[in-house]
Amino acid sequence: MKSLLKYLYSIAFRVLLLPFSLCKIRRERLVFTGLTGGSGYDYSGNPRYLSDFIQKQEPGKFDIYWMVTDPSRYRSEEKQGLHFVKHFTVRSFYYLLTASVIVTNGSYAPWFPFRKRQYLINTWHGGGAYKRIENDKPDANWATRKRAQFCAENIQLMVSSCQAANEKLFRHAFLYEGEILECGMPRNDFLVRGETVDAARKVRSTYQIDPGCRILLYAPTYRPDGENYMPDFTGLRKILEKNDEKWYVLYRAHRYSEDDASALEKTWSADVTDYPDMQELLAAADMLITDYSSCIWDYSFLYRPCFLYTPDLEQYLAKTGFYIPIQEWPFPICRNEQELEDAIDSYDAGQNRKAIQKHHQKMGSFESGHACEKVCERIRRKSICEENT
């Protein structure tokens, strides 16, 4: 019933917003949205990296508007020439339907009657092709799939991280038939190029982590059952610190999750769920522990140790499922804490690099380190350089 209501809601809004089609499209106007979970939108993700790139390369050339949940959070960014509008307001509808180019990173606004002269770019929000998305899960119904089809019909350009994403996600799950730009994810450019020093320094400064202390990032994905499968980090730290190394644990909950880090000792850990940029956390992490999250794709380009902690593998497989069998992912699968400790203890950097390189090849990686440049060239060409009025 919930999916049916969303479907009917999508149709109704398409009709209600039609009067905005009388407004003139502004060639210099760009609109960005960054999905952060549920109805939340922030200055984040691939759209943020593209927006920042444009601001740096061509300052003042475009009028850039961001649709966000809370515009008051971005006063400093407004001083740099960006505009922030509260999402899902009449004012936001006006800017969305008068921009020449719209950039989003999710199944955005199927109920928007975007116009043929507008150019909608979807960068998506996850690299690779791992867990199944909502409209492609075993229990997905026709209404959920229909909303995804509405989204696909709005899109003029998909930005892809790899060939597997083309086939499994965009063509199959979304039934998207349009153009795909095979350039990698904009947010991964600096990771692919290995330019992580500044981001790592920023994270350490934010959480006051000693320069000599190494960082373990724990970033699980969302669980439909709401369960928390956090491993015992007290035991893990003993394994990690046996060679006189000091480790600090950062906990990053999924945007849909209600988990918290209250069980972690505050002297050697921090909850970084509200930190605005996941890529900067990855850049700072010396080790990643996750489960089924697509952050393994982004992190893999750093060739650092990563482990999949999956005590609920059978349940997750039945409820959500995968596009690529988890056995073909490049990192060790750990079903319990003992297996996790053993995998960490026996880590081999050479084998890790070989497994990652093989995985990139099998997935057909498009990551180039120049995605921002390539996508922004398309934005420039489809806005100011083309007549849209």
Each predicted region: which residue ranges?
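C-terminal amphipathic helix plus adjacent low-complexity
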Residues: 1, 196, 337-389
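Membrane-proximal basic amphipathic "stem/tether" segments
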Residues: 1-38
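Active-site and donor-binding regions of nucleotide-sugar-utilizing enzymes
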Residues: 30-194
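Conserved catalytic-core segment of nucleotide-activated headgroup transferases in glycan assembly
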Residues: 42-58, 172, 186-263, 334, ...
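Short acidic-hydrophobic, aromatic-tinged amphipathic segments that line or gate anion-handling sites
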Residues: 83-88, 269-274, 329-343
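Donor nucleotide-activated moiety binding/catalytic core segment of transferases
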Residues: 85-100, 255-297
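A donor-sugar binding/catalytic signature common to diverse glycosyltransferases
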Residues: 102-124, 129-131, 275-319
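Catalytic binding pocket for nucleotide-activated donors in carbohydrate/polymer assembly enzymes
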Residues: 294-363
